[in-house]
Amino acid sequence: MQEKPTTVAAYAAGASLAAVALFYVFGPNYTIDGDEAGGNRKKSIVGLSNPANDCFINSVLQALAGLGDLRLYLIRELHRRELDGPEIYNQLPGPEEADQLREKRPDRIRELQQGTITRALKEMLDRLNERPIYKKTISARAFIQALEFAYRTRISRNQQDAQEFLQIVAERLSDEYHAGVKARQRAEKSIEFNPYQEREEAPSEIEVRLDDGTENGLPAIIDTKLKEIDNEYGFPFEGKLESQIECQFCHYKYKPNQTSFVNLTLQVPQRSSTTLNACFDGLLKTEYIDDFRCDKCRLLHAIEVKSNALVKAGSATDRQRLEAEIEKIQLALSSDPENALDGVTLPPAELAPKRRIARHMRITVFPKIIAIHLSRSMFDRSGSTKNAAKVAFPERLPLGGILSQKWFKLLAIVCHKGSHNSGHYESFRRNHLYPPYSTPSVFSSYAQSRAASENPSRVASPRLPASSSSTEPPALNISPPASTSTNSPLSLTPDSPSRPPSATDLKSPRPTTSSSRVSFQSTHSSSKQTISPTSAARNSSSLDTARLSSPASRSSLAERNASATDTEASASASLASRIRRRRKTADRWWRISDEKIKECKTSDVLGMQKEVYLLFYEIEKSGS
């Protein structure tokens, strides 16, 4: 019976809708994560509205949205607070600990422990990292309100500084992180010193066995005290600077002084052009300072004065007093010249000699994300002006010594156009897609998950020899007819003569620990290939004979070899195209000016030497 045209059309429409639905379900991000150059639709990201001179806020938030380690920290920190429960972070510290805190009010301390700004920033960055189909603009008002409530003040919109806003946000995040760490430590101490809680003593050592191929394995011991190691990752913006003073006369080195930082301020020299490394040299290079009164030199001067007074002392009491003071000063010189001396009268500080000192500065703890502020302010009698020097900055920044060198990758910058008192901020952020939004191999990931195990069994599974068929004709006398087969791999080659199975062949080997741990997929795939070695040998012999005797078979073999060569060439070409596509994706940047967004390249970003104001570098992981 002939079907109606309407029925055929309905069937076709239903099949098309089903195909579209399958593509939408199983590959939702394929059009997003694939090669954007192939599509006509222009991709973009979420912009921020600017109702009242909010460009300094928008530029910093867009730059923070492009930092993967920051987003990872926010997710981990909030998830940890949810797992611990609100009761840990609602508990206030004791009076002794509260006196040492910078914040004294109980409600402020509780907000720090709860991480209010951490949660608000995560929600803000999650919204900025969406991939909209069409142009989308949101407001940062919710985050600004949370920040204003945390500081109990209003953020003015009258030409504010982006670096000041970044400093406020970063310091607040750092304070919330350290408050959460102290709250967790306080909760652990309360559990340890709880006399009413019965705890079972866990063994300090656990005996395990490592798989080394033998039957019983290799005995080993794991120390459970490794679990006590603190697994704190730290705030990604926080690093430590160490400064040390050395006297150039007596060569005494003061105790190093460590300070924490959430961003580094580098002074831009007053010249037409410079480099970022030159700005770092201004911070980390050795600085020489004159007219400094060294503590050790002051003690040496005191010994000299006391010794002269001892020579001129007339009474025994004065002589004993001076000898005791000289002894104390000598003890202080050998132990610690910086500590104050009790019971010793030193000469006036104005009489102490002035020395030349060297001040060394270095970064001892590198942050995961280093935020660099290029200070372009110049002050004179008439007022302040902007330093418009060109600062060349690299895409990969090396920091540290030769033995402990760290490499950082540029992820975002904030630029300022205008004068010192007015202008506009815009940001550049690298076009990165972080999980769970990034699925560049939607369809290949399933095929890769079905791949066989990389560790096959060392010993083949025991199986009985296959019986030969009596009706099988000989293969043109090229190889003797295989009457029986063995488990040896030699029976799979057509050139090897078959032999009767021996008792050793029929004996099944004893499986070891490692050989029994084989995935189901590898066993299943290997069983398909080794079901019948006898039939495989007969088929191989007959196929090789047919190929040798038939010219058509030889031509078809040549065609197959040519097609295999073409397949390999196409595979290598596709691999090269994927590499080029990956390089092209890494070269993409977003140029964001409030709600206006457009794409640019790395060369465009590195060319913003006159306008660059803030730089965000992320430390490179090993193997990246």
UniProtKB/Swiss-Prot annotation:
Reaction catalyzed: Thiol-dependent hydrolysis of ester, thioester, amide, peptide and isopeptide bonds formed by the C-terminal Gly of ubiquitin (a 76-residue protein attached to proteins as an intracellular targeting signal)
CDD domains, sorted: Peptidase_C19F
Protein name (record): Ubiquitin carboxyl-terminal hydrolase 16
Superkingdom of origin: Eukaryota
Disulphide connectivity of cysteines: none
Biological process (GO), any one: proteolysis
Keyword terms, alphabetized: Hydrolase, Protease, Thiol protease, Ubl conjugation pathway
List of catalytic residues: 55, 424
Region (Disordered): 453-573
Top-tier EC class: hydrolase
One example GO MF annotation: cysteine-type deubiquitinase activity
Organism: Emericella nidulans (strain FGSC A4 / ATCC 38163 / CBS 112.46 / NRRL 194 / M139) (Aspergillus nidulans)
Segments of skewed composition (Polar residues): 518-544
One GO CC term on file: cytosol
